[in-house]
């Protein structure tokens, strides 16, 4: 069960090291397997892709069956309920509105004889990986697909491993709702490799985004450079900062919501109230009993969960900035008062009625967030991840003439005489 630490008596940083190091991708056996899969798909294309799909997913595919057909989409709509469609439409609206606000514009500055600026262009093609098989994550479709759509990406390709009955109808409906028409029934490292290099059936893309297991994460990391990626995401995590005003029931529920992801997920409570800490611990035990994934939750909380009692909120803020959690909840009396002191977090949820799952599904902000301390230097997925910038420069003859000697001087200081000559030939005779 989740362990309690009293930092008012003794600080134990071991728990933080354990949590931050839990997702290091250092399994050499898996890395070698991923490397072999990538090389095989690169060389043998469809043949290797379909062999791995049968080996790992038990699905026998070919060039005719790998792509989801229109009738499969229609059938998916028949399998989902009306309340799902209504909730999905609300989520799409909110997520789209949030990401529309992120759009940047091309800009140009004009001086006498000089024009410079930056031109924005959407990526031409993007591949979205959506976990599948027995799982169903329509929210991943929305969070990865909508910012790409808002950015103006022309070709969005989605891959998701199929179960015995195909890809989840919830996933197919979500993709169709946001206009993704090119969907393939593949997953794992082999799908990532297929998107990076292209095969006879799968198009090559410029960028790959979306979550997956360790094979998917390692493949994305290995292929970065051949193709752009969003990030190498680790296990999910939440840090809750709470004071005596917080509801033990709410805090416990929020910690449990992350612990159910998998046994590597991390759920931490940092509180100024020992009484709250004890109540939350009891509430966790009570709520766990009626949750479906309680075995996973128990393992997660045992290995990577913690309830930490500290002296004051300043210490709590220091812990949050050090851990740089994926999700940070501020369940305190005046959360906006300390927001300015939070430097490192993927997403911040303020107040007792802003639970993390609200951000996972419906509110609008993206749920693709940096994990494992990388919120110190990475940001959430956004429209900007699907846009590239080109610098633009124009000088008239007169404008170049006014700075030619300076350019020549700087080039010669670096002993790049051809650079200097490129300017000289425009003004000086041989």
UniProtKB/Swiss-Prot annotation:
Substrate binds at residues 236, 258, 261, 327, 360, 414, 419. It is an enzyme of class 1 (oxidoreductase). Keywords: Amino-acid biosynthesis, Histidine biosynthesis, Metal-binding, NAD, Oxidoreductase, Zinc. One of its GO terms (cellular component) is cytosol. NAD(+) binds at residues 129, 190, 213. Pathway: Amino-acid biosynthesis; L-histidine biosynthesis; L-histidine from 5-phospho-alpha-D-ribose 1-diphosphate: step 9/9. NCBIfam families: hisD (TIGR00069). This is Histidinol dehydrogenase. The gene is hisD.
